[in-house]
Amino acid sequence: MDKNKKYTPVNKGHSYDLETDERINEFKRKLSSGWEDEYKEYRRLWEELPNKRIVRDYPLLVDLETVSRCNLKCPMCPTITQEFLDKRVTPFKKGQINLDLAKRIIDEVAGKIYSLRLSWIGEPTLHSKLIEIANYAKKKNIKEISFLTNGFKLNMDYFKKLVDAG
């Protein structure tokens, strides 16, 4: 190792309190519950459909932009431009989709999609009801719920709430 360079371990050796025996056993139980076959089929379709130019009635994944603003000002990102801010569509005039509209969209796609991503351009953790939206999607049996984040708002309490939401 070069003595002049600083190295930071990825997780700094932390063992978070989310890694409990109960959670580990729940994970192991779910490993044998049969979801793996459904997930493999989802991933197979993810690759196969575009290659064979097959279009389904519903996509495998829906991106639901929950927030059209960000807490950073990265120079390459369009969210910092006035043009972007001026052209935001009606549900985003205040910077985030309202909870009722998010639920209506989830109701529309539930049972038809495998995966829901609660982000696109904006920073989803700025949405005041993100955890509630994720929980609602999980209750509607959407298998995979995800979002892309810059991580600035994440802390252990928020992370636990997200994990509990599904």
Task: Give residue ranges: language-model regions.
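Conserved alpha-helical substructure of the radical SAM core
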Residues: 3-165
